């Protein structure tokens, strides 16, 4: 359980990141990077939380996939989705990551067997400060998915979600060149 100070620090940092991205103070610097390495960095960030809940994170990828991405900001975007997957998946659940290659882009699917997102809320979840009804009582401020979409869009990519009562799949479409 987070202390009040930790929650306030998290909120402040999230607001600063959002403000800097929106105002253009920080610009993304895409360069040829390994998506695999970015994913592994994000997994390391949420690993302790997943372990606490006995959640298994799977990412079996024998091929290295490269794309024009800002390493740190893309890791931030993936971490936001992974953090939500761990947060909304019950103990003993599974969070999976899979990369699929297409001619001009890579698709990263992040799936979970969590509580799911009602269909009527799916179009709203990327809005600033939006929190769904099912997130009541679960820590969060409604900035993570908003930031994630902004980060991915600024790199000429996009994000989609498919969800039902058995879990969610967030798909990030990332330009290779």
Where are these regions (language model features)?
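Acidic ATP/Mg2+-coordinating residue in the GHKL
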Residues: 112
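Short alpha-helical segment of the dimerization/phosphotransfer core of two-component systems
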Residues: 3-8
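Conserved glycine-rich
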Residues: 156-161
């Amino acid at each position: 359980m987070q202390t009040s100070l930790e929650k306030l620090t998290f909120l402040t940092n999230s607001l600063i990141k959002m403000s800097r991205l929106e105002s253009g103070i920080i610009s993304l610097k895409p360069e040829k990077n390994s998506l695999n390495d970015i994913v592994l960095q994000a997994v390391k960030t949420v690993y302790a939380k997943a372990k606490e809940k006995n959640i298994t994170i799977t990412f079996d990828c024998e091929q290295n996939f490269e794309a024009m991405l800002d390493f740190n900001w893309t890791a931030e975007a993936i971490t936001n989705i992974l953090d939500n997957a761990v947060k909304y998946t019950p103990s003993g659940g599974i969070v999976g990551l899979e990369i699929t290659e297409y001619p001009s882009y890579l698709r990263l699917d992040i799936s979970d067997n969590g509580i799911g997102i009602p269909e009527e809320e799916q179009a709203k979840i990327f809005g600033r400060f939006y929190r769904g009804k099912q997130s009541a009582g679960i820590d969060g401020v409604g900035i993570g998915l908003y930031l994630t979409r902004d980060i991915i869009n600024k790199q000429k990519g996009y994000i989609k979600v498919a969800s039902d009562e058995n879990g969610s799949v967030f798909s990030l479409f990332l330009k290779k060149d």
